[in-house]
């Protein structure tokens, strides 16, 4: 088209000279260019979803989401900007000319348009998809079901402040279909089945990486209900990966399973240690069931009551210690404790070492067979996989739980009794 060669604010050759005055405010009405990422995400060097009303990360963490105006690129102009009077003098219009005043009086007020530019979709990067095209899971659900839902007709302001868009990785080894509806254009990932074929593809490594990546992204933000629910989901994911039947069939996937699962257990334990040092009153009102929170807020010793609740929450989630039934949420009851995961992984590694099929080579290709038999009788501290599993016990010992806080069948842990990796 003929008009594509001319930028905004420039007059077309067929235009009259009187249109030059109208083009000047048109250029001023262009929306200012803002950063595609908000200030909070850019400061922490994290990926920003770029929603106008607030990115998903700031909404989850109840932070103020603001998109700063981009500075002009390139070298600054050498000459000072002309004043408004200079612009009028270029058109040979005197300041006291009544024609100029009458024309300027009819110029629309573009200040409101510039003020409302934050509501325009132009500030979003083209790489960001519509926020309503993603499924989200309600972390603020009173029942803590964390079911996937789609909200194509709801605004972002109606979503609670601790919503989370990341999937539930706990069903990594489930053979049944997903309970949620996949959005258009997305296909569910391939889940490992119970088939023990050596060629069976396994997605455990991908889910472990997603969990580690998500937990690391939560570190710069304060502890919230989203953090607690993420730890429960990561614990269920770790349990599913530990019970995977496809990873042990190959040496590389088995080694990756051991190392990444051990890393995830250490990260989960360290995150719970960080939760234990959080503000009990603020966190308790977010995490505890509403009825239990109302009862706690009526306590004469409010701070002491919430500190006791936080101690119970951490103790229940780390070592499955005693906790009030009314204070437990469904996601806390369904997720295994950190100590349960450590013990289950240790038992699995012992089974792997006792199995004659755990060697990476076939029997006819093995060398020094007597030394292989001696490997089964070595001390557990010499086995790397056992040491990786037990490294999370050192973190559990830092909580300082007393012996009466542990379940009856579990011995207490102390820094001296834990095995150093």
Swiss-Prot record:
Subcellular localization: Nucleus
Mutant lacking the gene: phenotype: Abolishes growth in the presence of gliotoxin. Leads to reduced growth in the presence of the oxidative stress-inducing compounds allyl alcohol, t-butyl hydroperoxide, but not menadione.
GO terms assigned for molecular function: DNA binding; DNA-binding transcription factor activity, RNA polymerase II-specific; zinc ion binding
UniProt GO BP: positive regulation of transcription by RNA polymerase II
A Pfam family per the record: Zn_clus
Record-annotated DNA-binding residue ranges: 38-65
Cysteine-cysteine disulfides: none
Sequence segments annotated as region (Disordered): 1-29, 346-371
Ranges of compositional bias, category Basic and acidic residues: 346-357
Annotated signal sequence range: none
Gene3D superfamilies per record: Zn(2)-C6 fungal-type DNA-binding domain
Polar residues bias: start-end ranges: 8-29
GO cellular component annotations of the record: nucleus
Keywords associated with the record: DNA-binding, Nucleus, Transcription, Transcription regulation
UniProt cross-references to PANTHER family, sorted A to Z: THIAMINE REPRESSIBLE GENES REGULATORY PROTEIN THI5, TRANSCRIPTION FACTOR RGLT
Role summary: Transcription factor that is important for oxidative stress resistance and essential for gliotoxin (GT) self-protection through the regulation of a gene encoding a putative gliT homolog, even if E.nidulans does not produce gliotoxin itself.
Protein name: Transcription factor rglT
Gene name as annotated: rglT
